[in-house]
């Protein structure tokens, strides 16, 4: 990708693309591996820091290329350790990246678009509409920024980022080429060396692109389902009017069958009080998914202003989970993380919170967590 400076941004180039770039400037293809390792393993954005690259080539790179990531606007840390970065992309829009630590695993939730065109009724990102696709550099740049923030390199066993999920702002399959390029860099040993099983793309159901995805890359697939019948899903996830459930699940099964290796589909289901959390919805879901190798992730709704929806009670959540368990499914309930910094699922809107209000909220939540911890010890 050529930036506003007229130079090629090397950050978003896959290894084959980097090889082509070096050939285009009269250099050997092996230089791609050297430079790619500097960029992604060590977070370098200055060609002069590349000590195994000769001075003449470094000067040529300065003339034709640059390494430019998104601009960090703010970083917040939740009381539970969740981190959220707000970054500004070339279009001027802001997007959000969220890091969720849990046990020995660290999951980075990456955005693919500024805003979203799908307008799912329970998601705050969709309420702002679509602004722009992110370039491959802006997608992988979120991993690059987070990795640098933690001061780790991919070769380390104890690296902070072990999993990446394309579940941030936007519909990844509507920014297909750039997202695929970024995921290839994530999995490349010269990039971040993340296992294909630990890179997950989440889609609301762009059926033709699910089939195309299976032809070009091997990553885990998650489906944002949220309703067990077409009538309700048409209302909650409007793209269902174009690609109804029968068509959508057929595409998901085709994708999973291509992967083999006992891979399964992750089904995401946001629970909305008195909307999709009733026993009949669980029974419909069991019937809908009976022929689909899958695990189900229930997501209690994370409130945001003017959404019109509420989070179900804990009893309602447990009841729904138990019914699915009895139906033979592996079911987990996602623990809400980062809601004190608006980093929970469905809350990403690319806004920068007022610093004073942000600090007050963080302190209040931290104090609450500390008091609850002390009470539990007593």
From Swiss-Prot:
Cellular component GO terms, alphabetical: cytoplasm
Active site location: 96, 345
Cofactor note: Binds 1 [4Fe-4S] cluster. The cluster is coordinated with 3 cysteines and an exchangeable S-adenosyl-L-methionine.
Record flagged with keyword Transcription: no
An individual GO BP term: tRNA methylation
InterPro entries: Aldolase_TIM (IPR013785), Methyltransferase_A (IPR040072), RlmN_N (IPR048641), RNA_MTrfase_RlmN (IPR027492), rRNA_lsu_MTrfase_RlmN/Cfr (IPR004383), rSAM (IPR007197)
Reaction equation(s) it catalyzes: adenosine(2503) in 23S rRNA + 2 reduced [2Fe-2S]-[ferredoxin] + 2 S-adenosyl-L-methionine = 2-methyladenosine(2503) in 23S rRNA + 5'-deoxyadenosine + L-methionine + 2 oxidized [2Fe-2S]-[ferredoxin] + S-adenosyl-L-homocysteine; adenosine(37) in tRNA + 2 reduced [2Fe-2S]-[ferredoxin] + 2 S-adenosyl-L-methionine = 2-methyladenosine(37) in tRNA + 5'-deoxyadenosine + L-methionine + 2 oxidized [2Fe-2S]-[ferredoxin] + S-adenosyl-L-homocysteine
Pfam families: Radical_SAM (PF04055), RlmN_N (PF21016)
A single GO molecular function term of this UniProt record: tRNA (adenine(37)-C2)-methyltransferase activity
Binding site for [4Fe-4S] cluster: 116, 120, 123
Positions of the Radical SAM core domain: 102-342
Protein's UniProt keywords contain Signal: no
Other known facts: Reaction proceeds by a ping-pong mechanism involving intermediate methylation of a conserved cysteine residue.
HAMAP family to which the protein is assigned, alphabetical: RNA_methyltr_RlmN (MF_01849)
Protein family: Belongs to the radical SAM superfamily. RlmN family.
Protein known as: Dual-specificity RNA methyltransferase RlmN
